[in-house]
Amino acid sequence: MSFDVPADRRYLESHEWAQPDDDVVRVGITDFAQDELGDIVFVELPSVGDRIEHEAEFGVIESIKAVSDLYAPVSGEVVAVNDDLEDAPELVNDDPFGDGWLLEVEADGDDYESLLTADEYEAQIA
């Protein structure tokens, strides 16, 4: 099976993605991760103003099959969360790289550079 792995972002081995836009980094889970989890029924995210740390747990995603921790690809302050997921968690399944994004972080540091490239992540899930 083939999964989308957009080249315009970087990846954690735990299947989260990061897409920078200046100092703000948008975060979500990969197409591979949403497929493995199955139908997403609940997403627990931090609040705006909370701080998250690179590779530390920042939330939980729940499907009909499993509950999984979410890990931060970058460190920084949460500046936005995707409130649409509260009423429509299935957006993560439908569009994991678009409408199903999880949160945005004002990154402080160079964690992004240490993440896997699209090619490296693709090799991991092959």
Curated annotation (Swiss-Prot):
GO terms for cellular component: cytoplasm; glycine cleavage complex. It comes from the Archaea. Residues 24-106 form the Lipoyl-binding domain. Keywords: Lipoyl. GO terms for biological process: glycine decarboxylation via glycine cleavage system. The modification N6-lipoyllysine is found at residue 65. Its cofactor is (R)-lipoate. Disulfide bonds: none annotated. Binds 1 lipoyl cofactor covalently. PROSITE patterns: BIOTINYL_LIPOYL (PS50968), LIPOYL (PS00189). The glycine cleavage system catalyzes the degradation of glycine. The H protein shuttles the methylamine group of glycine from the P protein to the T protein. The glycine cleavage system is composed of four proteins: P, T, L and H. Belongs to the GcvH family. This is Probable glycine cleavage system H protein. The gene is gcvH.
